[in-house]
């Protein structure tokens, strides 16, 4: 049985990318090629490419599925009425005026109390707790106040404060549905020029929405990974995407998820027969080695943290040993890791 320690690996801290490259598609791409079955049925070849070379690994019959969520400025600093400092990180927008949020304070705020945020620009009312989160009531439409006064919530391993450059580069060029507190980072490598080349090559694309929560950075704390409680995220699958998947299957093409968030949404909505059901809902799907994939054939993804649920996910897709070999190579070849880092192309084992 695989344990948490099986998903650890040494990573020099200087390989954690602290800023995005100026040219989105200039990042590197590690292609994990699966060799034809022979004496070693799980043999792979690791190929170093530029991300813009990905077009050479795609066919006109293929379908790229992107997550069009948009990162909101979800972080606030403020004060309680007592003067004590408070930090708020919005996790999910529940309705026009209400959000779920993490609240950090020296003392737990009482239900009904006010939190004065953004240098007292406005105050939110503390509502009931939901697990580790608080419901907060905004005095005006929450998304408007978030956009006007909030700060971009960069991942915890990025050490600088967010600036105007991050506000552009920590969004995909196709982001349109606000609600995420972390970017679907595999999509950061795509730009308009690469989309034009994909269109010219006949490679089709479609979109879903999954609002990435801060739980994506939540560490696994149990050595027995089956005991880990996965965070929940909201997703939506359109009838147009379901039709595109059906057409792709008819044409003999592959469904390629752009990012682990797209993969999790697709697998959550997939039926046992491999068809995709339109609709929306919450998913806490936890994909680990041994999972039987219903829909996704390949994945474009960044490099993930040691001992993370996302490292377990890519190991389930490509194979534990293949991922270990790929990550060893990536460290030796000085690939850039995590959200602002380089990418991989993986096919299902």
Swiss-Prot record:
Keywords: Cytoplasm, Queuosine biosynthesis, S-adenosyl-L-methionine, Transferase
UniProt subcellular location: Cytoplasm
Catalytic activity: 7-aminomethyl-7-carbaguanosine(34) in tRNA + S-adenosyl-L-methionine = epoxyqueuosine(34) in tRNA + adenine + L-methionine + 2 H(+)
Family matches, as InterPro entries: QueA, QueA_dom1, QueA_dom2, QueA_sf
Pfam family, one: Queuosine_synth
EC number(s) from the headed UniProt entry: 2.4.99.17
Alphabetized GO MF terms: S-adenosylmethionine:tRNA ribosyltransferase-isomerase activity
GO cellular component: cytoplasm
GO biological process terms on file: queuosine biosynthetic process; tRNA wobble guanine modification
Family named by the database record: Belongs to the QueA family.
Record NCBIfam families: PRK00147.1, queA
Function: Transfers and isomerizes the ribose moiety from AdoMet to the 7-aminomethyl group of 7-deazaguanine (preQ1-tRNA) to give epoxyqueuosine (oQ-tRNA).
Name of the molecule in the record: S-adenosylmethionine:tRNA ribosyltransferase-isomerase
Organism for this UniProt entry: Cupriavidus pinatubonensis (strain JMP 134 / LMG 1197) (Cupriavidus necator (strain JMP 134))
Gene: queA
